[in-house]
Amino acid sequence: MLREGTQNRLMGRCRQLLRFVLPVECLSCGHPLSTDPVPFFCAACWHTIRPLHQPVCARCDQPFVSPAATTYTPNHQCRYCQEQPPDFERAWTLFPYLPPLRDAICSFKYRGKLTLARPLAQLMINALPQGLDADVVIPVPLHPARLRAREFNQSLLLADQLGRHLSRPVSATNLVRTAVTDPQTALSRQARLRNLRHAFTIRRPHDLAGKRILLVDDVFTTGTTLNECAKTLRKAGSGQVFALTLARTVETDLVPDRLLTEQTGRPLTTLGI
């Protein structure tokens, strides 16, 4: 028979373990979960996720501060796309990388909460741009060493759901990452370019000859990873390369405060701005 104090300590540890495995609180707002349709998130938070607003760059979906940016040229491109046109034909990104979506992506990607793959992919499917079409869907690959460490490729899990929805084959082994690169997160745009140069290769170029490719990734930051993949595919003889990402980082000097608060439902102070 365990003493009462020992029993209480054991029960407390069991509750902590259970909360880690099966959280009873929303990972975004901390409110108790009940029968919410999305794992780890309450319905109220999930429903605050809003698509990226117009106006955006006609090539890479970079948000513009003002609608005046496209007043005279509807197909206006951002400075980066004008100065150094990307190798992809068009990149669509569907949502701003802000809470609660940011919380969901981080939990999915870095904490292994794989049950979020389906609802995140469904967000992408629900917001697919009109006219999107391709012959093959390809996820941005991880280097084998990083794949072994993480045990899954988040981009492949998203691409698999998209391929099913679009009735298109998903090629997960043709575009491969051959170089171990430093994490892109803390690097500048130029450092990212240097970091990823010659990082990818194509195993079977004939399988992709002339085919339109849809690259899929989770987050668009500067676009250097997608662009290096697109460059590799084009050099191997593919047709047009398009890119689709679930979310993109938004810079506070490019996106008005109003947009940030509208798309999160939270005051700026809670966003750390």
Question: Where in the sequence are the language-model features?
Answer:
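Glycine-rich phosphate/pyrophosphate-handling loop used in enzymes and phosphotransfer proteins
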Residues: 1-216, 221-273
